[in-house]
């Protein structure tokens, strides 16, 4: 898994965290309160039940996606759901917002150090990846995944409202689309 390859798993364990992987036996259907496009779905209960997890940290990477346009914090919760995820890709934007009504992430750390600009989500060639100072080399951290994705959209030259799932999640009250209202500050290290 990418956590092992990236060094995230070792660093998290060193800091005392329990690193959990998706256990297919723990999927169960849960209602989606206020769901617009889906009313229930199979979720991995280890990640969504409050008595199972103290803090849920989402560590997505910023990349192009052929169906949703981008995949970052909000889209990354697809890794915590079961059933036929292909069904989620039809009319995807409200479904991404609906899944985030159940999966409530405490902290998002968006890895935009290298950004996949084309041919996502899997990538095509090395030329599809940008790691320039102007277009990438960012780590975005927030308790608000909508704000994270809103800032992330700007790295692709897009406005947050250009991405359907960001607007859907904001309209559902899941976070702030204007990331500047969340006390955004850029640090150079």
Language-model segment annotations:
Residues 1-189:
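N-terminal and secondary-structure boundary signal
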